[in-house]
Amino acid sequence: MLKAFLESRAEILRWLADRRTLAAAVWLAAGLAVSAFVVWAFAELVDVVVEGESRRFDRTVLLWINSHSPEWLDGPMLLATTLGYYWVVVPLLAVAVLAFYLVGWRLSATLLLVSTAGGSLLTGVLKAVFGRARPELFDAGYEASFYSFPSGHATVAVGFYGALTLILAYRLRGYARWIVVILGVALVLLIGFSRLYLGVHYPTDVLAGFLAAPLWLVFVGAAYAAWLSIRGLRAAEARRKGR
């Protein structure tokens, strides 16, 4: 009995020493830490918005952007904001998920789908809860419906394009990885900025969207890391019993 006990513990220790297990543990710990920070930051932002303390900041930033924006940016900003609409994101999501399944990246496909759908659902709920009206500081010739806080475009940008960037960065190596990361981050920021340029969101709306999506994304990643850990423990136990 003592021998069997020692063998089972040795098997678990070997599993814990495996690189994948350590990576999962690191991701889980990092996920919990980032989640805690994002929750705190989002709560602080909500408090500032609800109390009206962000009103002056929001107005100042929007008016500054409007007064310092050249007309030639209108076209690029409209294109950037179009990339955040569901009628563009959904087809791109379908293509990406199908492509990942075809190359055998099934878990990545699932994560991308859950990240995008969950972030979108979270945004809809938060918009309904806070019911913040959209800014009407200037007429940019562009209209948007529904509530303002948080920005759905910012959330979708991180939930879809951000998740896609993380997946590709994990799969790629060398310069290709950094190129994907730089382009992905630039696209997310560009979509968020386009909402300010067009005057349909306050800066705090966009910031809240950027925070809401990572909260869901990190939660999904932490859940995946925990699942890997549990699966590894079960596999180690199964190997022990099979002896």
Label each region the model flagged:
Residues 1-88, 128-142:
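N-terminal transmembrane-helix/juxtamembrane module of multi-pass inner/ER membrane proteins
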Residues 26-30, 87-90, 109-114, 178-186, ...:
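Hydrophobic alpha-helical transmembrane segments
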Residues 38, 42, 46, 122, ...:
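Alpha-helical membrane-inserting segments
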Residues 43-44, 124-134, 190-201:
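C-terminal ends of transmembrane alpha-helices
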Residues 50, 56, 92-93, 97-179:
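Membrane-interface loops
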Residues 80-81, 127, 149, 201:
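Residue-level signal for helical boundary/lining positions with a hydrophobic bias
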Residues 137-243:
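Membrane-embedded catalytic cores of phosphoryl/pyrophosphoryl-handling enzymes
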